[in-house]
Amino acid sequence: MRKLTSFVCGTGAGLAVYYLQRLRDPQATVNNSWTNSEKPVDPWALWDTNWDCREPRALVRPLRNSQPEEENRYNAELEKAKAKKARHIILVRHGEYLDVGDSDDTHHLTERGRKQAEFTGKRLCELGIKWDKVVASTMVRAQETSDIILKQIDFEKEKVVNCAFLREGAPIPPQPPVGHWKPEASQFLRDGSRIEAAFRRYFYRAYPDQEKESYTLIVGHGNVIRYFVCRALQFPAEGWLRISINHASITWLTISPSGNVSIKYLGDSGFMPAELLTHRIPRDAKNVV
């Protein structure tokens, strides 16, 4: 009996010490999942709210004091600087083309590339979008793709903006590097500055006086579109080459009034027959011209 009493007392004391220690342990309460934490796993995951330099707080004079008149002035200016509507930017890669000759003038769409552009034009027409602006790269393959699409959608060809900033190029050295494609450092410097300028030209939240959602169609190139996607979503831009998009595919990005950016489609080409799905440049004219 004495042994049993000693055992019970010892066990009880041990349990008491254990639970007391658990209560004192700062890690006694944990989240069920890392996604429940309000703190990002990596500081680089933090969203830059002023990425386009149009965050309302960055556009108005800061508070000079805590007087009601000054606070009213600040709040009124802040409200006036806020965007009200979203901007939708739809990016279309050119159709398949034949890489022959030393100049852009010889890089015309293949027959398959023209069919791809026709399907894309029909798809954009089916979406029923009222376009506010259509922009096309000045390279031949993008111009030909744009011309075919314009026959399908409700937009006047004379209003198309031709932009040399959108021409294909090498935006930034990719990570990881690839052995089959190694442009000179000077090409990255030249093309990268131009493509970044194109991004800043077309990607920004709406102006405060925009009263309805806007839709901009941009017909461009694979490298440029992939770079735009990484920049818009604030992913490391060096990762652009990890993305693959088909010829004449549709990528849809939305910039909300708050400045947040979301992607609706990435390289969508599911509206085409399987035999028209391509993403590489054919090196032989046989059966493609």
Curated annotation (Swiss-Prot):
GO terms classed as biological process: positive regulation of mitochondrial fission; positive regulation of mitochondrial fusion; protein dephosphorylation; response to anesthetic; response to heat
Top EC class of this enzyme: hydrolase
CDD domains registered for this protein in UniProt: HP_PGM_like
Membrane disposition: Single-pass membrane protein
Gene Ontology MF, one: protein serine/threonine kinase activator activity
Catalytic reaction list: O-phospho-L-seryl-[protein] + H2O = L-seryl-[protein] + phosphate; O-phospho-L-threonyl-[protein] + H2O = L-threonyl-[protein] + phosphate
Domain of life: Eukaryota
EC number: 3.1.3.16
Disulfide bonds: none
CC terms in the record's Gene Ontology section: mitochondrial outer membrane
Key word Methyltransferase present: no
Keyword Hydrolase recorded: yes
Primary location: mitochondrion
Cell compartment(s), UniProt: Mitochondrion outer membrane
Spans traversing the lipid bilayer: 7-23
Keywords of this entry: Hydrolase, Membrane, Mitochondrion, Mitochondrion outer membrane, Transmembrane, Transmembrane helix
Pfam (any one): His_Phos_1
PANTHER family in alphabetical order: PHOSPHOGLYCERATE MUTASE-RELATED, SERINE_THREONINE-PROTEIN PHOSPHATASE PGAM5, MITOCHONDRIAL
Family from the record: Belongs to the phosphoglycerate mutase family. BPG-dependent PGAM subfamily.
Biological role stated in the UniProt entry: Displays phosphatase activity for serine/threonine residues, and dephosphorylates and activates Pk92B kinase. Has apparently no phosphoglycerate mutase activity.
Subunit structure: Interacts with Pk92B/ASK1.
Protein's name according to its UniProt entry: Serine/threonine-protein phosphatase Pgam5, mitochondrial
Organism: Drosophila erecta (Fruit fly)
GN (gene name): Pgam5
